[in-house]
């Protein structure tokens, strides 16, 4: 009788390598290991072979860089999505693509279940489980690391007992996740929020001390909110992001040290490196300021915050994400132009922007000759704008005077105390 099959999100690390054998021993599954290339720079040929070596029935590698950039990173960029105003959702965004690919392969292979290597303490378990359920409500979900509850030493002992290769970097004190949108680093000394992150925690960015002394200016072209060219060179989005990671990272741009509120109810200290994300979000936002009407520019940040929360909290495959993203897309119709950014010693600074859809009028803004603003119209506008305030003051004159007298009395008492 054929065994049931399960599709495992496989990274090549210790946890998911042990999971292959554990799933076989515990559930008698045939394991199909799936690794996605989302721009993390891993040797996926090695990862693919390792899964088979450990005992997977089949090992599949998917080049998902373009899909990740176009379908997940781009909507987040158009929304300037930053969880709690700091984190560009590096890991969160990739989980939804991984979930979708796993379910697609599971359905194609006739698998009855999917599995991931998340612990019971993090956000990713929520993102995976909720996404799997949204994409296929009937599929079974197994989380080996969450289930087995082993210590690190017990896991290593299991690996040795079953001839599972132990990664050579196992003594690395950090837990790292990386894709083309950035890199996250936690654990080790970083668990102390008072301790400064050591340089060893960083990889994509130079320290300010080591960054070039001379600033570098770059130009980013956007078409309806999408970056399409870097310094005049048109590039696929994934390639543009990876190239910008190197350029901005060389100048130390994109280091984020953040104590964030996890979905599971705890606070965690994370160190992120997001050179391209930091630069692109900055440039995109500035182009929006140039091309969007005031009401849109002032309201959109509220929607941006909601989308960031939805992405962080595992709700990509939900009606709220669809609705919020539809609004964001509507705001991008005229966000087309070029932004010039100066990179220097950890800073990305917008120093120029231009657009055929610019709502900035030099003739209306200038204080020099050629000023076309109707200064005389200001008086009538001010009278109408301030009319509700004037009426309120007239109706509530006694209350206003009472508050005024109270304030004066308090000041007098303070002066008396000083004397």
Swiss-Prot record:
Homotetramer. The gene is argG. It comes from the Bacteria. It comes from Brevibacillus brevis (strain 47 / JCM 6285 / NBRC 100599). Belongs to the argininosuccinate synthase family. Type 1 subfamily. PANTHER family: ARGININOSUCCINATE SYNTHASE (PTHR11587:SF2). Its EC number is 6.3.4.5. Keywords: Amino-acid biosynthesis, Arginine biosynthesis, ATP-binding, Cytoplasm, Ligase, Nucleotide-binding. It catalyses: L-citrulline + L-aspartate + ATP = 2-(N(omega)-L-arginino)succinate + AMP + diphosphate + H(+). GO terms for biological process: argininosuccinate metabolic process; L-arginine biosynthetic process; urea cycle. This is Argininosuccinate synthase. One of its GO terms (cellular component) is cytoplasm. It is an enzyme of class 6 (ligase). PROSITE patterns: ARGININOSUCCIN_SYN_1, ARGININOSUCCIN_SYN_2. L-aspartate binds at residues 119, 123-124. InterPro entries: Arginosuc_syn_C, Arginosuc_syn_N, Arginosuc_synth, Arginosuc_synth_CS, Arginosuc_synth_type_1_subfam, AS_cat/multimer_dom_body, Rossmann-like_a/b/a_fold. ATP binds at residues 9-17, 117. Pathway: Amino-acid biosynthesis; L-arginine biosynthesis; L-arginine from L-ornithine and carbamoyl phosphate: step 2/3.
């Amino acid at each position: 009788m054929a065994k049931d099959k399960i599709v495992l999100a496989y990274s090549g690390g210790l946890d998911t390598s042990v999971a292959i054998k554990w799933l076989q021993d515990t559930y008698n599954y045939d394991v199909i290991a799936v690794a996605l290339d989302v721009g993390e720079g891993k040797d996926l040929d090695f990862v693919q072979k390792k899964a088979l070596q450990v005992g997977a029935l089949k090992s599949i590698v998917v080049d998902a860089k373009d899909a990740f950039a176009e379908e997940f990173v781009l909507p987040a960029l158009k929304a300037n999505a930053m969880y709690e105003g700091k984190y560009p959702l590096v890991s969160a965004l990739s989980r939804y693509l991984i979930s979708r690919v796993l379910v697609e392969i599971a359905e194609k292979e006739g698998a009855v279940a999917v599995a991931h290597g998340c612990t019971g303490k993090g956000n990713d378990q929520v993102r995976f489980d909720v996404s799997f359920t949204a994409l296929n409500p009937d599929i079974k979900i197994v989380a080996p690391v969450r289930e087995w509850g082993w210590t690190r030493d017990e896991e290593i002992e299991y690996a040795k007992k079953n001839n599972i290769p132990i990664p050579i970097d196992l003594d690395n004190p950090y837990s790292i996740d990386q894709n083309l949108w950035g890199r996250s680093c936690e654990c080790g000394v970083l668990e102390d929020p008072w301790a400064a992150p050591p340089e060893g925690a960083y990889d994509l960015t130079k320290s300010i001390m080591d960054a070039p002394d001379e600033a570098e200016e770059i130009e980013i072209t956007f078409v309806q909110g999408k970056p399409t060219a870097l310094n005049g060179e048109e590039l696929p989005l994934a390639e543009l992001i990876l190239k910008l990671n190197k350029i901005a990272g060389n100048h130390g741009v994109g280091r984020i040290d953040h104590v964030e509120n996890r979905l599971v109810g705890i606070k965690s200290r994370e160190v992120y490196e997001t050179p391209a994300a930091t630069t692109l979000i900055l440039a995109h936002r500035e182009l929006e300021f140039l091309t969007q009407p005031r009401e849109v520019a002032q309201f959109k940040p509220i929607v941006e915050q909601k989308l960031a929360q939805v992405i962080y909290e595992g709700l990509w495959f939900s009606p709220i994400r669809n609705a919020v993203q539809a609004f964001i897309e509507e705001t991008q119709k005229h966000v087309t132009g070029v932004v010039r950014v100066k990179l220097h010693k950890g800073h990305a600074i917008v120093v120029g922007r231009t657009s055929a859809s610019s709502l900035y009028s030099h003739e209306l803004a200038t204080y020099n000759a050629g000023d076309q603003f109707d200064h005389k119209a200001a008086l009538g506008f001010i009278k109408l704008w301030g009319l509700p305030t004037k009426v309120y003051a007239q109706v509530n004159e006694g209350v206003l005077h009472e508050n005024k007298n109270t304030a004066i009395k308090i000041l007098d008492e303070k002066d008396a105390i000083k004397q």
